[in-house]
């Protein structure tokens, strides 16, 4: 009996997290189909899990980045620039894919929804201004409000300052980083219970009946995201590593994308991505900075959402869009997507900004936003899964490419 209990505990604490998450997913679907009331009650597990991830993510980013920079050795490469380049290429490519799909399969919206009582940003300048204000945020406010741009700036600043500290100070910061990482691993082990609660409560609250009216729009949105995740991203990774990208792509989708799909929060998925980078044996100096940065600016899914819904509104109103305008929309959508994390409501509230390019009034644009909220159960989940899994994917591609370069240099030196 004790042996069976120890085996069960070992499976819970050390077993495959992906298998456990799939079990939680299946259990959530079964519970929602059997008892709506019980499924709603189980939602507390999901709320607690997402809350725990959001609670630990800001302090994790602060301590990890600070420790990484404080203990950084002179001359050691961090590879942030090539990672940023891939982030921008990936986001712009996603916007282009969304334009092509919207032209090939134009969607029409029933624009009769009530305009939401929310205020979108008035222009791209306001979005950029919001990002700049995030940079100079009070560090306590940045931690409390999960302002990752502000947290990164303070972490980098403190890390540089601590590089001039004593060895014992650096050691203490490193120990703090290890302690927070250990807490994160404990939280992540509760992912199956969290996913179980999230799936059960979501299905009990909304079901999928409300989504059928927007089936065509959802097919274009989800199709675009699948195309980016399974075709465009692998091509970018292949260009970087010059070998089969799919083992890496599928692992990132499985271990990062699945969790992100159900938490629907790039910030909450930061600890999951950090743990996956550690498992992939990537350079900590690179991923400790690039993961929180990716959660802020690497927004391929958001670029697709903004582009598809904006073009759907234009098509509904009979507005003709030429190729140069479509390309300009791709650029604007990419810039908007990079600022999505700094706007309450994310990518949906940046749709009016893109709609203004075509002279679409704010009232109609806000009705498009309302449609976005209706389909958000799937749209937001898929968007977050693409955004978050791409962060790890591109970091891994850059790290593998750099490792290959170093190996080639060593080989040539030996000849």
From Swiss-Prot:
GO cellular component, one term: plasma membrane
One annotated GO biological process: serine transport
The UniProt record lists the keyword Oxidoreductase: no
Annotated compartments: Cell inner membrane
Pfam family, one: SDF
InterPro entries with a match to the protein in the record: Na-dicarboxylate_symporter, Na:dicarbo_symporter_sf, Ser_Thr_transp_SstT
Membrane topology: Multi-pass membrane protein
Record-level Gene Ontology MF annotations: neutral L-amino acid:sodium symporter activity
Entry's transmembrane regions: 21-41, 45-65, 85-105, 142-162, 193-213, 217-237, 289-309, 331-351
The organism's place on the tree of life at top rank: Bacteria
Catalytic reaction equation(s): L-serine(in) + Na(+)(in) = L-serine(out) + Na(+)(out); L-threonine(in) + Na(+)(in) = L-threonine(out) + Na(+)(out)
Main location: membrane
Keywords on record: Amino-acid transport, Cell inner membrane, Cell membrane, Membrane, Symport, Transmembrane, Transmembrane helix, Transport
Family as reported in the entry's similarity comment: Belongs to the dicarboxylate/amino acid:cation symporter (DAACS) (TC 2.A.23) family.
Function according to Swiss-Prot or TrEMBL: Involved in the import of serine and threonine into the cell, with the concomitant import of sodium (symport system).
Protein name: Serine/threonine transporter SstT
